[in-house]
């Protein structure tokens, strides 16, 4: 009892902060010290266990999470679980190395719709801070082209046209043949490659099935499948009617003759030939116009000149679209020949014309004299 009372007095003195005297602190045996230490350790263990339980309960995530985190743009984004599942599936199907590459591919496929809704491409404002993936190679170039084209006011139509032609023009069939025909006809009219002749590319023998989809203003909306065959068939029929009408109009045009110079085989020079041009109905035109004949100027028969025939350019000889040798006077041919370097045939024609002019007044005077004699 005395020992217990002394221990209690010592604990009271420690709690109160008073310094006990050395003689007042009783002696504690080893067994009593062991009991006190075990009780203290048990109390600390129970307190630490309760603290760990509180920490674990706070870190625990909720089980009902409708979103899944997907890596992209250098940070973590949140998207619906269905979208994330589809991205994972596309990554496996397309053989991409990461889900971010799949998202980049999806953005490339959605480029026309993005341009239609926002007016710009998928390139972000802070491109310098973006860790763009260059594995595919086509993503960054496509984005840069879209950004460059978006600076112009016609960026929407120009970019859409390029994408429309690229998506449908893998084998070169996206080019409308009507455009080719119009361009070829314009070039032929400007440069004169087909002079008053029907262009061979615009022949009436055309397969109507080769006419592809015509030019559309809206590239992002496909026409209805039911209305498309009827429209294409109507346009094909109209195009054929226009070709037939143009063919009838050009069939009545009289083809122009072609002048040529044969190579000289002897020292006498070469011959000057006029070759009549015949169109598709060559035999009928030859029957209707018997005046088309092949005739030549032999330089050996003309003593005047050096014996060489002048090669005049086609532009100077085709005077007003008229036919030389059929309805053009000899003076016109002589005028055309004067502009060239030689003078053999031109001088001969001038002399011949001069002789004809002198013969006409002589014949008129002779006829007048004959009439006076009869009177």
UniProtKB/Swiss-Prot annotation:
UniProt KW keywords: DNA-binding, Nucleus, Transcription, Transcription regulation
Region of interest (Disordered), residue spans: 1-76, 220-248, 349-375
Biased composition (Basic residues): 58-67
Annotated Pfam families: TCP (PF03634)
Span of domain TCP: 63-117
Transmembrane domains' residue ranges: none
Cysteines paired by S-S bonds: none
Subcellular location: Nucleus
GO biological process: regulation of DNA-templated transcription
GO cellular component: nucleus
Major location (coarse): nucleus
Xref: PROSITE patterns: TCP
Protein's recorded name: Transcription factor TCP22
Organism: Arabidopsis thaliana
């Amino acid at each position: 009892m005395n020992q217990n009372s002394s221990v209690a007095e010592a604990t009271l003195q420690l709690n109160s902060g008073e310094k006990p005297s050395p003689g007042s602190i009783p002696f504690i045996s080893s067994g009593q010290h062991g009991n006190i230490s075990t009780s203290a350790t048990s109390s600390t263990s129970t307190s630490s266990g309760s603290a760990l339980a509180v920490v674990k309960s706070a870190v625990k995530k909720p089980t009902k999470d409708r979103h899944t985190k997907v890596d992209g743009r250098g940070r973590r984004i949140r998207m619906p679980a269905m979208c994330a599942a589809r991205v994972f599936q596309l990554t496996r199907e397309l053989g991409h190395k990461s889900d971010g590459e799949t998202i980049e591919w999806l953005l490339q496929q959605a480029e026309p719709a993005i341009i239609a809704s926002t007016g710009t491409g998928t390139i972000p404002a802070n491109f310098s801070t973006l860790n763009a993936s260059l594995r595919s190679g086509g993503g960054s170039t496509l984005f840069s082209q879209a950004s460059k084209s978006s600076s112009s006011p016609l960026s929407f139509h120009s970019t859409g046209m390029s994408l429309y032609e690229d998506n449908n023009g893998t084998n070169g069939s996206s080019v409308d043949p009507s455009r080719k025909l119009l361009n070829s006809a314009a070039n032929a009219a400007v440069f004169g490659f087909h002079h008053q002749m029907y262009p061979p590319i615009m022949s009436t023998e055309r397969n109507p099935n080769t006419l592809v989809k015509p030019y559309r203003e809206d590239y992002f909306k496909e026409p209805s499948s039911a209305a498309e065959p009827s429209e294409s068939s109507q346009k094909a029929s109209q195009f054929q009617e226009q070709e037939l009408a143009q063919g009838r109009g050009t069939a009545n045009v009289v083809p122009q003759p072609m002048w040529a110079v044969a190579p000289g085989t002897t020292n006498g020079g070469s011959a000057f030939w006029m070759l009549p041009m015949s169109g598709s109905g060559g035999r009928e035109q030859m029957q209707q116009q018997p005046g088309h004949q092949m005739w030549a100027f032999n330089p050996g028969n003309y003593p005047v000149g050096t014996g060489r025939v002048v090669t005049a350019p086609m532009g100077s000889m085709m005077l007003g679209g008229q036919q030389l040798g059929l309805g053009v006077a000899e003076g016109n041919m002589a005028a055309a020949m004067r502009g060239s370097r030689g003078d053999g045939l031109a001088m001969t024609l001038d002399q011949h014309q001069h002789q004809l002019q002198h013969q006409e007044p002589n014949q008129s005077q002779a006829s007048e004299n004959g009439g006076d004699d009869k009177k």
